[in-house]
Design a protein with these regions (language model features):
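Conserved Nudix-box catalytic region and its N-terminal flanking loop in Nudix hydrolases
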Residues: 28-70
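Nudix hydrolase/Nudix homology domain
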Residues: 40-42, 108-161
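Active-site-adjacent beta-strand/loop module that shapes the phosphate/pyrophosphate-binding cleft
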Residues: 80-109, 119
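A short coil-to-beta-strand element that immediately follows conserved catalytic motifs
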Residues: 69-80
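Acidic, metal-coordinating catalytic segment for phosphate/diphosphate chemistry
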Residues: 1-26
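Short, solvent-exposed loop/turn segments that connect beta-strands within catalytic domains
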Residues: 24-30, 88-91
């Protein structure tokens, strides 16, 4: 679906994968956000699909490279969001599939350690920090989850409504 204000020189929607790194703390469920390299905006670790890898695995790798987190990724996305990526001569509409990641380990240093900032925040704060409205909506939907929830894995596979 294209937006009404699509720039004339834009290409069709492209696909990316993202990780939604989560951990359980005494405050409740926390989300790991990273800054983008070009503009410094807060977002989730994301990137292009990787040849020879399933999308959920590519999302897991992006989380390790961009945020220094390791864990178990859901094989199914929890949702999607869209954003406009500015290129030299055009804007591309990107649809991003978001895969929850139950974080089991954080690294002291990682591939993009010196290129990005990392922040662990509650879902409601994460929703305020990101600039993509659809991603913010997805993060707000996680806000009611608290430490009393038995297991993050209950969030990993979305329940049908």
């Amino acid at each position: 679906m294209r937006k009404a204000n699509t720039p004339a020189n834009s290409s069709p929607r492209l696909h990316q994968v993202a990780s939604l790194p989560m951990r359980k703390t005494e405050r409740g469920i926390e989300i790991c956000l990273v800054t983008t390299r070009e503009t410094g905006r807060w977002t989730v670790p994301k990137g292009w699909p990787m040849k020879g890898r399933k999308d959920f695995d590519a999302a897991r790798i992006e989380a390790e490279q961009e945020a220094g987190v390791i864990g178990k990724s859901s094989k199914k996305p929890i949702g999607t969001f869209e954003y406009w990526k500015r290129r030299e001569t055009q804007f591309d509409l990107i649809e991003v599939a978001v895969y929850p990641l139950k974080v089991t380990k954080t690294l002291a240093r990682w591939k993009e350690y010196e290129e990005r900032q990392v922040r662990w925040v509650l879902p409601i704060e994460a929703a305020r920090l990101v600039s993509e409205p659809q991603l913010a909506h997805l993060l707000r939907s996680l806000a009611p989850i608290t430490e009393e929830d038995a297991d993050i894995s209950s969030m990993i596979v979305p329940k049908p409504h």
